């Protein structure tokens, strides 16, 4: 399932992946999707500063993350590029809501220079969350470049179980799935 609100990026996604690309406002994605699909893995890069109506909203990325988290399958993984202000210290209310749905695994602060070739220089966080109810310590680090990020990303990747949510569902007798 692919969702992108920008028409140009929608066309790119169709060209690369084929199939349908929805154009929903990600802030309301869980309410707007008609299908009961619960993806195992979601990757997102939400807007950092403004909503669809272009009003300024410093919490818009957090609102997108929470909406996506509601749609993620139990046991699933969410990888997000988030603004540096999305932390338990700087955005307590949204962080608490997100952590009511997800377990944070990784928060890597990345300097804007990483994206210079792509025409932007905004500092970001690469974040990984799992939809599981377990206590674990989130890896928090500041990296200078992508090469430095690999060891932290690999460490978090190793925490993902081999059995995916869809596999667990397939193992449940049909009568119990309803």
Question: Model-flagged regions — what are they?
Answer:
Residues 1-4, 21:
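Short, hydrophobic beta-strand segments that form beta-sheet elements in well-ordered domains
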Residues 114-177:
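Flexible, glycine-/basic-rich loop-and-beta segments that form/coincide
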């Amino acid at each position: 399932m692919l969702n992108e609100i920008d028409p140009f990026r929608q066309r790119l996604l169709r060209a690369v992946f084929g199939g349908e690309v929805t154009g929903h406002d990600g802030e309301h994605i869980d309410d707007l999707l008609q299908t009961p699909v619960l993806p195992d893995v979601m990757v997102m890069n939400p807007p950092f500063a403004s909503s669809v109506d272009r009003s300024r909203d410093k919490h818009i990325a957090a609102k997108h993350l929470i909406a996506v988290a509601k749609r993620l399958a139990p046991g699933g993984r969410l990888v997000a590029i988030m603004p540096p202000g999305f932390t338990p210290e700087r955005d307590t209310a949204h962080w608490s809501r997100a952590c009511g749905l997800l377990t944070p695994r990784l928060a890597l602060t990345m300097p804007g220079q990483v994206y210079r070739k792509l025409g932007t220089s905004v500092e970001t966080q690469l974040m990984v969350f799992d939809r599981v109810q377990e206590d674990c310590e989130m890896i928090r680090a500041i990296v200078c470049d992508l090469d430095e990020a690999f060891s932290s990303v690999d460490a978090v990747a190793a925490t993902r179980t081999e059995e995916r949510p869809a596999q667990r569902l397939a193992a449940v007798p049909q009568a119990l799935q309803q």
